[in-house]
UniProtKB/Swiss-Prot annotation:
PANTHER family: UPF0102 PROTEIN YRAN. InterPro entries: Restrct_endonuc-II-like, tRNA_endonuc-like_dom_sf, UPF0102_YraN-like. This is UPF0102 protein Swoo_0351. It comes from Shewanella woodyi (strain ATCC 51908 / MS32). Coiled coil: none annotated. Belongs to the UPF0102 family. It comes from the Bacteria. Pfam families: UPF0102 (PF02021). GO terms for molecular function: nucleic acid binding. HAMAP family: UPF0102.
């Protein structure tokens, strides 16, 4: 028996990440990597704006219920993303300005918050 209960949210997340990547690329950012996973956290997108590295969390909600995508990021998730980014910076020996952005997608609305946290 195949368990599909997590398949639909994962597909929505991947679709949201693709939308976010295209949205940011249209605004001049350069794609580096997606879905970087470590045991202690995950980075949805890594992009660059000139020499600046951008670690991006993507939140997708098909409906704006419960505060929508803009309010879907918890302090614990921020901590995990920061740890993952610090690890990525260390193993890739990055010595550059970095920032953390949030892309929040509610149905068809895309909100980009540079330096979100």
């Amino acid at each position: 028996m195949i368990d599909n209960k997590h398949q639909i949210p994962r597909e929505h997340g991947q679709a949201g990440e693709k939308l976010a990547m295209n949205y940011l690329a249209e605004r001049g950012l350069n794609f580096v990597e997606a879905n970087v996973r470590y045991k202690f956290g995950e980075i949805d997108l890594i992009m660059k704006d000139g020499k600046e590295w951008i670690f991006i969390e993507v939140k997708y909600r098909s409906k704006a219920q419960y505060g929508g995508a803009l309010n879907a990021l918890s302090p614990a998730q921020i901590g995990r993303l920061r740890r993952a980014a610090e690890h990525y910076i260390q193993i890739h020996k990055i010595d550059a300005v970095c920032r953390f952005d949030l892309i929040a997608i509610d149905a068809s609305q895309i909100h980009w918050l540079p330096n979100a946290f």
